[in-house]
UniProtKB/Swiss-Prot annotation:
Xref: InterPro entries: Hist_DNA-bd, Histone-like_DNA-bd_CS, IHF-like_DNA-bd_dom_sf, IHF_alpha
UniProt-listed SUPFAM superfamilies: IHF-like DNA-binding proteins
Molecular functions per Gene Ontology: DNA binding; structural constituent of chromatin
Species of the source: Mannheimia haemolytica (Pasteurella haemolytica)
Gene: ihfA
Alphabetic keyword roster: DNA recombination, DNA-binding, Transcription, Transcription regulation, Translation regulation
Keyword Transmembrane in annotation: no
Matching Pfam families: Bac_DNA_binding (PF00216)
Family as reported in the entry's similarity comment: Belongs to the bacterial histone-like protein family.
Keyword Amino-acid biosynthesis: no
Protein's name in the database: Integration host factor subunit alpha
Length: 99
């Protein structure tokens, strides 16, 4: 399984829209910075046709160190959650059924 990188996204922008490399890289960085910044500020990020990024509060809980078996406390924290939108789910399903 391959992974799409930010560099590859920028290269696709260069190919499809004829952007300069610097502009394409800056565009990609700014796009992801907007998502990061919004999440840091507690905002949900909704990308129509793609999905939603939101924050979920996780409570503190007891845990166990898998190497030593020692009981440890896992502190409360905020985690980022992504929920794929309907259109994205349909396209992924369609692509997987064709392969």
């Amino acid at each position: 399984m391959m992974a799409l990188t930010k560099i590859e996204i920028a290269e696709n922008l260069i190919e499809k829209f004829g952007l300069e490399k610097r502009v394409a890289n800056e565009f990609v960085e700014l796009f992801f910075e907007e998502i990061r910044s919004s999440l840091e500020n507690g905002e949900e990020v909704k990308l129509s046709g793609f999905g939603n990024f939101s924050l979920r509060e996780k409570k503190a809980r007891p845990g166990r160190n898998p190497k030593t078996g020692e009981n440890v406390a896992v502190s409360a924290r905020r985690v980022v959650v992504f929920k794929a939108g309907q259109k994205l789910r349909e396209r992924v399903e369609q692509a997987s059924s064709q392969s």
